[in-house]
């Protein structure tokens, strides 16, 4: 089977946004106009095509990024193939966003025209910057009360530090929003309400907007000619680029992430979606427009690149695992190079295991079609893989490569969970392991002392949904304890410890002496180890034992048994015995050495501090600030946003549980908040004593 669409006609993109910016609705409209959805699914009635998990339909928020393939005929009449990845906008699911950005070539950042740039917009924007993803901006909900396109443009500059190139101006706003002005063609598009947005009329720019349109077209040209010397010189001499040249420059600047073309409309009222789809074709990259993916050659350990080409060796990245009620476990993978046939054996280079591809599926939200072959640039769902988890590389066994791994954040909240009946015990273990394979930001462990099962995640909602999925998908009923904060421990001063481990009981004994300097490690690094041994006081082959010994006790600090952060250990001296010394003896010595030293090096308890943003009507500002202060919060500042006030604060996670209920009652349900993990900070001594007493009693 030959490739049906050329790789340059592919667009792999996602839609990223703050919760409630209308992401699912926009995706729905895209699927509707590209002919895949016959009835528009509304999030309001819980029937959106992309939101296919039950909890998503109930809660009206997108949790799992579903991949969808659809097709669109561009302005030139040529059909392009779109692979769209739906990403969640709720902060507890940033891992899903990070994961999908990793495999996208471009993205549409959605803004709510009323709220502009919101906290989660900043988060996903930063993640997209990290992966250098070209982005367009769609200012959605132009029909909403308080919609302000021009303020949104300003906020992009102020809050994201990004350059938005305005491509369209809105005609009217709020309930008077009728259509848009196209600043390249210099005409107006006005949608016909009766046609469900399928038809529009191209008319002249309204007289009262001509001047504004001229001004913004000038700004558009000024920005885009900067990336091309010849165009810049011609422009300075008074020669303007023609429309095709402008589009070419916008495309180049977008792909190089120099600026971001900005459009507007209202997906819910079906206005502005088709020009956005044309813009995806015109401005977002195909797989061959972006740099070839880099990886590590397993044989030589050198860096290699894999071009987006069917004739290159196969390489693909598994970016999502999902349980499907009909097919079982599905692995979503992006093929970067080569081609894949059903039934082929591939190598998982991270796990060093071979896997056989059983079925290969092309996904449309929650319907699917079997395919025999897939090519570079495709996003496919694979059935039958046993060992593969998120972030693994699958490739040609004869040309092994490891593509860069994704980084996953450490969980900040944990709860104890118990099955309600004996019969649920085994099923619960199975369910939790399945869910952990799907979601790397969710962890499961057993508390050694109490034997309880502990689950950890990115926030209360994240864990609620895990427990909920366990009940629905695996039919396991469980009771959950109160949420626990993921505290950490560190040391605050330098300390040198000399420790000798001796054991003599007939036969070969054990002997190892180590002298280690422990000191705080600069922020950002969990643990660093260095050996300054000269003259063989500790033989080279024993030094890994010293490092391993220290690392083995970092998981349980001296104060309350929490994992330790920010420790640097330098081995400066030691002694060994020709017969009695071994790697194990040095491991035992360094372990005991660190335990002794940790108490004397000013051990300190750390807690996760969250960045909290509250958006509240002015009447409740005093109450909100007072309440945040009572939670040990530090107010970072406040600003007006329309008629609301935005309060920024840093608050310990320990004091934020059930905050949503308090905020609702305090503001009669009118205030909202978002919360992101920001950093770890020392716990005040009075609070630290309570925590130590509580946890030491449990340990």
From Swiss-Prot:
GO terms for biological process: ribosome disassembly. GO terms for molecular function: GTP binding; GTPase activity; translation elongation factor activity. Its main location: cytoplasm. It is found in: Cytoplasm. Residues 8-288 form the tr-type G domain. GTP binds at residues 17-24, 86-90, 140-143. It comes from the Bacteria. Keywords: Cytoplasm, Elongation factor, GTP-binding, Nucleotide-binding, Protein biosynthesis. PROSITE patterns: G_TR_1 (PS00301), G_TR_2 (PS51722). InterPro entries: EF-G-like_DII, EFG_II, EFG_III, EFG_III/V, EFG_IV, EFG_V, EFG_V-like, G_TR_CS. The keyword S-adenosyl-L-methionine does not apply. The keyword GTP-binding applies. GO terms for cellular component: cytoplasm. Catalyzes the GTP-dependent ribosomal translocation step during translation elongation. During this step, the ribosome changes from the pre-translocational (PRE) to the post-translocational (POST) state as the newly formed A-site-bound peptidyl-tRNA and P-site-bound deacylated tRNA move to the P and E sites, respectively. Catalyzes the coordinated movement of the two tRNA molecules, the mRNA and conformational changes in the ribosome. Belongs to the TRAFAC class translation factor GTPase superfamily. Classic translation factor GTPase family. EF-G/EF-2 subfamily. This is Elongation factor G. The gene is fusA.
